[in-house]
């Protein structure tokens, strides 16, 4: 028993990871079976937020308390997350998507291939237009990169044209989108990206 697609969502604190998971679940749940695993170091804050927002029924959302480095829990020792995913897959078989949201981390964050099938990395404009050219696995190797909160560009003095140029250089043809998740900009493109990666046959 497994899900068709395990999707990792990573990025710095406050970039919009939970907002992305919320938005995607609301967009996809009419047509797909979905579950969520969230990561926090000492709490289950993100899981409780999604439960309170009624993004999915409560049983489909598991909060993992990693107790340490967010990166370790999704890469070097992903056993807590892997067990949570397996629990959901056994309980709600069949599932189309399982989203695994990492705790906030730096640009070196990446998921173990044992845990997810593809990864989405979220950065936001408020961190400055230099972020894409700083590189790191999240920028260069994620399956999809999102540059969120584009509405804040003028307020923080970020140049979206510079971010676009640097991102295209760093990504080397890999997909990426500008987004403003608070009003739905980019959601349709992300949804189509995910749907295009669903295997034809369940494992």
From Swiss-Prot:
Keywords: Chaperone, Cytoplasm, GTP-binding, Nickel insertion, Nucleotide-binding
GO BP term, example: urea catabolic process
Main localisation: cytoplasm
One GO MF term attached to the UniProt entry: GTPase activity
Keyword Iron-sulfur attached: no
Subcellular location: Cytoplasm
Name of protein: Urease accessory protein UreG
